[in-house]
C-alpha cells in the first residue's frame, strides 16, 4: 500500500493506493504499514483533485476499490450518484436504496466512507438543511459544499429542494 498527501485550503488530504486502485481518501493519518511514495494512480489522483479544488473538474474519474457491508455499498453507490453542487438528505438516500426508515444508518455508512470526494458524502445533509456530521469534520464539509457553489445560509431559505422537504 502506498500513500501520498496533498495540502488544500481545508487541510491535508491523504490518498492511499493498493494494486492500482485508490482504497482511501481522507483527512486522516495514513494506515500503519503504508509507505509514502508516488505512482501513476496517485499522481493522476492528485492532478484530478487539484483540478477539482480549482473548480475546473466536477467529476473525478479514478480507479478505486472500497469494501463494506452490502448496505454500506448500496449507500456509497447512491452517494456517487449525487451531482456536483447538489445535496440530498439522509432520508432521501434511505428511501432511494429501499430502506425508508434507515436515515441514521445511512449517516453511519456515510461516516464510514473510505473514499472522501470519490464517494461524495459531503453532499448529504439533514432534513432541515443542517449540515449533519462529516468524518473529516464540519470545516471540510462546509468548504467542499461552498466550493461546489452551495451558499450554506441562503440554501436553507431559498433552495427549492430543501423547501420541498420541509412540507
Question: What are these regions, as identified by a protein language model?
Answer:
Residues 101-145, 152:
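Short glycine/serine-rich loop segments
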Residues 1-101, 147-167:
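Basic nucleic-acid-binding alpha-helical/helix-turn surface characteristic of O6-alkylguanine DNA
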